[in-house]
């Protein structure tokens, strides 16, 4: 923000907005804690998207509001908008088809299957950094074009749903038949802080494709959605871009066919914009002056809009009918020979040297130009595997249409989780493997059935530790980002989850529970696994002198192996699970940061994380049966001993390994080793925020509160994937 232009005309009034010396007195100004301690634990990540930031209040029900929507009228308004060209941002060829497709694509395209974060599900394109990414130039205009429609329909349609629906309507208006549309994306009201966009400090910093396979990053350069369209690091080489394309689309869960279909389909309509050098382009929306009102990238070149627009710096039109669906992308790709050239802005692109002028100008009907392509478009011709698929689509346009329809639906719905979350009249009936489909329920256990099942579990010989551990193993795969994982489906009993090291308890416990399920035939295995946790916790609470009934909602089903994509479910295997004192790799962040990461995926607050760790430690749920963090002389009792002993100054802690991952607590007087611990344990005494929470549960009057809080947090985790209850 410019202090000369944006301080309420202070120069004209003669008043300075600050005291002499220029000190900023506003809240949050000045040197912050993270400036002093940049490695400070990000406990604040667990405070995101609370009711304090939500203007609609905790009683707002989006599904209920959506049911009041005149869906046909909304689509009609979107269709009319496509050709309602506005002078402040004129439409290419009189149509916003390409712009809205790009908006939807770039909203959904931030999704990464490796950690489930990103994607279009929360409408994050409204906020920084995405609203100001170099790859999202001019999408601020697309969102402003949509505002009158959003204003008209209000809370009956979320921004997140509207962005994707606008892209769908644009495709349909071009003559393309989409696969369907599922609404249900709920808006949030602040930027996601948990998404790791990378460590780079400068936009468009290049990353090697191999690095993408090791980190949850979706693009080859900071600030891009996928790959650099000029080739890796502006190389201009189509073949060298193949690895980058596979890495980025692969991180979204796309195979080669889906990748080719998405690139070609996305480039069948619309154009890129590079009328002049980027030096004409002003600040992005987040850095623009206050009078810009959230719009950015104002251009000083000519009119700055229409034929003078600068977006990517590339000036490419792929097809002869850029507002109507066709197979011209593949026809042009293989029909002509391509030579490297540069756009008016100086960006590397390719032109069909032997083609006539067959491409219409977007604003002057009397003008034509030669077909042009991006460097990465030609990758689909020159990479051997991509070329096979591209030629098949060239010769079979219907196969291309079907592949793109399905890939587009996957792109725009991948982060929504199971189909149970979809709402609206255009939800496809077909179940797709990437939706983690579930069968219809076979059981409807009565209250009497549940009582009998609990008795059978209690009499099975399983320990409290085993019962609680197996329930946690089943439910804790849930990821709040893409709503995958969780206890529903009992996929703990299927590959790959049953073979994960962290789930070693399953080999001992599942046969017992499977026998109970088979013998009683009253409930699904998924329900029985969760019910085992209920039995274990109730027994542990009773042993602590607290009688409590753990809430249990039956209705889970058992997935089949053929409904489970092993490769995609393998991505849910935790690198670390601090709740079970599990850490598979030491080369990825710190143990305590990974604990925060896991808690954030489980949508837990800091108090919920704290009470769960403390309770699970005294119940002996470490994945390997170790005594690390088991700060109690009475394991299996749901006590506050973890907190009381951790904060007890009688004990002094010292590391026992070179990596500072393992510790022992010795009596300060005798030197005797009393307890052992990991970083996931000691962080509740070392971090000031977590220590403050631990102190609550370490107090002498906290026991009953602790049990109640533990049960509430536990039930929350068990029901995270019960979208039928939400």
From Swiss-Prot:
<keyword id="KW-0575">Peroxidase</keyword>
<dbReference type="GO" id="GO:0004096">
    <property type="term" value="F:catalase activity"/>
</dbReference>
<dbReference type="GO" id="GO:0070301">
    <property type="term" value="P:cellular response to hydrogen peroxide"/>
</dbReference>
<dbReference type="InterPro" id="IPR002016">
    <property type="entry name" value="Haem_peroxidase"/>
</dbReference>
<dbReference type="InterPro" id="IPR019794">
    <property type="entry name" value="Peroxidases_AS"/>
</dbReference>
<dbReference type="InterPro" id="IPR010255">
    <property type="entry name" value="Haem_peroxidase_sf"/>
</dbReference>
<feature type="cross-link" description="Tryptophyl-tyrosyl-methioninium (Trp-Tyr) (with M-252)">
    <location>
        <begin position="105"/>
        <end position="226"/>
    </location>
</feature>
<keyword id="KW-0408">Iron</keyword>
<dbReference type="GO" id="GO:0020037">
    <property type="term" value="F:heme binding"/>
</dbReference>
<keyword id="KW-0349">Heme</keyword>
<comment type="similarity">
    <text>Belongs to the peroxidase family. Peroxidase/catalase subfamily.</text>
</comment>
<feature type="region of interest" description="Disordered">
    <location>
        <begin position="1"/>
        <end position="33"/>
    </location>
</feature>
<feature type="cross-link" description="Tryptophyl-tyrosyl-methioninium (Tyr-Met) (with W-105)">
    <location>
        <begin position="226"/>
        <end position="252"/>
    </location>
</feature>
<keyword id="KW-0479">Metal-binding</keyword>
<dbReference type="GO" id="GO:0046872">
    <property type="term" value="F:metal ion binding"/>
</dbReference>
<keyword id="KW-0560">Oxidoreductase</keyword>
<feature type="site" description="Transition state stabilizer">
    <location>
        <position position="102"/>
    </location>
</feature>
<dbReference type="InterPro" id="IPR000763">
    <property type="entry name" value="Catalase_peroxidase"/>
</dbReference>
<keyword id="KW-0376">Hydrogen peroxide</keyword>
<dbReference type="InterPro" id="IPR019793">
    <property type="entry name" value="Peroxidases_heam-ligand_BS"/>
</dbReference>
<dbReference type="Pfam" id="PF00141">
    <property type="entry name" value="peroxidase"/>
</dbReference>
<dbReference type="GO" id="GO:0005829">
    <property type="term" value="C:cytosol"/>
</dbReference>
<feature type="active site" description="Proton acceptor">
    <location>
        <position position="106"/>
    </location>
</feature>
<comment type="function">
    <text>Bifunctional enzyme with both catalase and broad-spectrum peroxidase activity.</text>
</comment>
<dbReference type="GO" id="GO:0042744">
    <property type="term" value="P:hydrogen peroxide catabolic process"/>
</dbReference>
<feature type="binding site" description="axial binding residue">
    <location>
        <position position="267"/>
    </location>
    <ligand>
        <name>heme b</name>
    </ligand>
</feature>
<protein>
    <recommendedName>
        <fullName>Catalase-peroxidase</fullName>
        <ecNumber>1.11.1.21</ecNumber>
    </recommendedName>
</protein>
<comment type="subunit">
    <text>Homotetramer.</text>
</comment>
């Amino acid at each position: 923000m410019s202090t000369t232009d944006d301080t309420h005309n202070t120069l004209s009034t003669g008043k300075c907005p600050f005291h002499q010396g220029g000190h900023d007195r506003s809240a949050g100004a000045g040197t912050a804690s993270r400036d002093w301690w940049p490695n400070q634990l990000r406990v604040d990540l667990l405070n995101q998207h609370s009711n304090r930031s939500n203007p609609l209040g905790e009683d707002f029900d989006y599904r209920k509001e959506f049911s009041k929507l005149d869906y046909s009228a909304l689509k009609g308004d979107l269709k009319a908008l496509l050709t309602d060209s506005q002078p402040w941002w004129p439409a290419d060829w009189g149509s916003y088809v390409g712009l809205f497709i790009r908006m939807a694509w770039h909203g959904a395209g931030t999704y990464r299957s490796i950690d489930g974060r990103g994607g279009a599900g929360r409408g994050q394109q409204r906020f920084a950094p995405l609203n100001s990414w170099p790859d999202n130039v001019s999408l601020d205009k697309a969102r402003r074009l949509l505002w009158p429609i959003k204003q008209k329909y209000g809370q009956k349609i979320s921004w997140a749903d509207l962005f994707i629906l606008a892209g769908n309507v644009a495709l349909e208006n071009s003559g393309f038949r989409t696969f369907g549309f599922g609404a249900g994306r709920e808006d949030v009201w602040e930027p996601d802080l948990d998404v790791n966009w990378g460590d780079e400090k400068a936009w468009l910093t290049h990353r090697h494709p191999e690095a993408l396979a090791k980190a949850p990053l979706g693009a080859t350069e900071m600030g891009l959605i996928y790959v650099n369209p000029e080739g890796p690091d502006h190389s201009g080489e189509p073949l060298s871009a193949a690895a980058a394309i596979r890495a980025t689309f692969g991180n979204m869960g796309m195979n080669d066919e889906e990748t080719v279909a998405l690139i070609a389909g996305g480039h069948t309509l619309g154009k890129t914009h590079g009328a002049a050098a980027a030096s004409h382009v002003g600040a992005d929306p987040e850095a623009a002056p206050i009078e810009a009102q959230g719009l950015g990238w104002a251009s000083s070149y000519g009119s700055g809009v229409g034929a003078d627009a600068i977006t990517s710096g590339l000036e490419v039109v792929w097809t002869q009918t850029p507002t109507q669906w066709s197979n011209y992308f593949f026809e042009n790709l293989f029909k002509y020979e391509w030579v490297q050239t540069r756009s008016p802005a100086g960006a590397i692109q390719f032109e069909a040297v032997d083609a006539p002028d067959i491409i219409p100008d977007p604003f002057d009907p009397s003008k034509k130009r030669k077909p042009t392509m991006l460097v990465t478009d030609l990758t689909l011709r020159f990479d051997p595997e991509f070329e096979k698929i591209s030629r098949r689509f060239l010769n079979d346009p219907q196969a291309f249409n079907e592949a793109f329809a399905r890939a587009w639906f996957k792109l725009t719905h991948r982060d929504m989780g199971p189909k149970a979350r979809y709402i609206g009249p255009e939800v496809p009936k077909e179940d797709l493997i990437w939706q983690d489909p579930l069968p219809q329920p076979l059981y409807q256990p009565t209250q009497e059935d549940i009582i009998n099942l609990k008795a059978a579990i209690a009499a099975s010989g399983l320990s409290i530790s085993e019962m609680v551990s197996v329930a946690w193993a089943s439910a804790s795969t849930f990821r709040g980002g893409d709503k995958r994982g969780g206890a529903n489906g009992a996929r703990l009993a299927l590959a790959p989850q049953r073979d994960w090291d962290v789930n070693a308890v399953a080999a001992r416990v599942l046969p017992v529970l499977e026998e109970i399920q088979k013998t009683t035939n009253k409930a699904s295995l998924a329900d029985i696994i969760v019910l085992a946790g209920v039995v274990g916790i109730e027994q542990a609470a009773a042993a602590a002198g607290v009688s409590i009934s753990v809430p249990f909602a039956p209705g889970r089903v058992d997935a089949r192996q053929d409904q489970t994509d092993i490769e995609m479910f393998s991505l849910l295997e935790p690198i670390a699970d601090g709740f079970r004192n599990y850490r598979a790799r030491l080369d990825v962040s710190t143990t305590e940061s990974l604990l925060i990461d896991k808690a954030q995926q489980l949508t837990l607050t800091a108090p919920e994380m704290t009470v769960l760790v403390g309770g699970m430690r005294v119940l002996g749920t470490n994945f390997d049966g170790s005594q690390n963090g088991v700060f109690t002389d009475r394991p299996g009792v749901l006590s506050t001993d973890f907190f009381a002993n951790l904060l007890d100054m009688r004990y002094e802690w010292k590391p026992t390994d070179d990596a500072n991952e393992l510790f022992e607590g010795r009596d300060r007087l005798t030197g005797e080793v009393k307890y052992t611990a990991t970083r996931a344990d000691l962080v509740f005494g070392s971090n000031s925020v977590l220590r403050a929470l631990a102190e609550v549960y370490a107090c002498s009057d906290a026991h009953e509160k602790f049990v109640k809080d533990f049960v509430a947090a536990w039930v929350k985790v068990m029901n995270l994937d019960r979208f039928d209850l939400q």
